[in-house]
Amino acid sequence: MSDNHLQNSDKINRKGFFSILLNQIFHDEPKNREELLVLIRDSEQNELIDQDTCDMLEGVMHIAKKRIKEIMIPRTQMITLKLHHNLNECLDVIIESAHSRFPVMSNDNNYVEGFLIAKDLLPFMKQSANIFCIKNILRPAVVVPESKHVDRMLKEFRSKRNHMAIVIDEFGAVSGLVTIEDILELIVGEIEDEYDDEETLNIRKIQKSTFSIRALTEIKEFNETFNTNFSDEEVDTIGGLVMKEFGHLPSRGESINIDGYSFKISIADSRKVIQIHVTIPENKTPVLIEA
């Protein structure tokens, strides 16, 4: 008997084995995606698989139908660096945001020049800051359309060993970014690391009377934390309140005093305020906040 015949026979046997196994578990083979999802849920209810496995299988099924636009981080929430940033400016943004990868925008903020990985700055820590040029250490930017399917994006991340991609709209303008973590969380649920608490906190204590505030923090949350009475009738967020008081879009380093509270812009770009440092009056005691 030829080797090819044996191999074909082996494939048939294996196919038959898995068909028998599938029938034993599911009784009837699913004919479409919806039936397969029902069988997966039935298997969990019958304790053939546990809840975590069920959730992961459902996650795998669902990502094939989703597009990048549905899961991306919108441009308004992207934390970026600029091509003209010096070493200290880069470090300030990295430390404040606790991220490890950053899109680097052109000076006019219209194009992504590449990605900067925080660890690539380490060699410059022992050298003169004057020799630093962000353009020399940029990684190529991966660019994908909003319409790309999530499962295909995951395959591309894996095959090319990338972790982040810039998302563009139908006109070629930057509309957001997507990371491999965003996709994996659709399958396995929230992925937490040692920095996640810092990244998700809207209000974080950094010194005795100074706090780092996300610009998107709602005024209501700020009032509850610091026992203040800032109005949210015209604006909803602390970033909106600060911009309203400035009367313009403030730049990094600008500060303003509002009712005894000092607001200093710590991260901003040409379109929005991202992070703010707030120094509270000495006689004020906020609700307990993690340092």
From Swiss-Prot:
Matching SMART domains: CorC_HlyC
Gene3D superfamilies cross-referenced by the UniProt entry: 3.30.465.10, CBS-domain
Any GO MF annotation of the entry: flavin adenine dinucleotide binding
Domain CBS: 72-131, 137-194
Keywords, in A-Z order: CBS domain, Cobalt, Magnesium, Repeat, Transport
CDD domains: CBS_pair_CorC_HlyC_assoc (cd04590)
A Gene Ontology term for the protein's cellular component: plasma membrane
Top-level lineage group: Bacteria
Its job: Plays a role in the transport of magnesium and cobalt ions.
Record-linked NCBIfam families: PRK15094.1
Family assignment from sequence similarity: Belongs to the UPF0053 family.
Protein's UniProt name: Magnesium and cobalt efflux protein CorC
Source taxonomy: Bacteria, Pseudomonadati, Pseudomonadota, Gammaproteobacteria, Enterobacterales
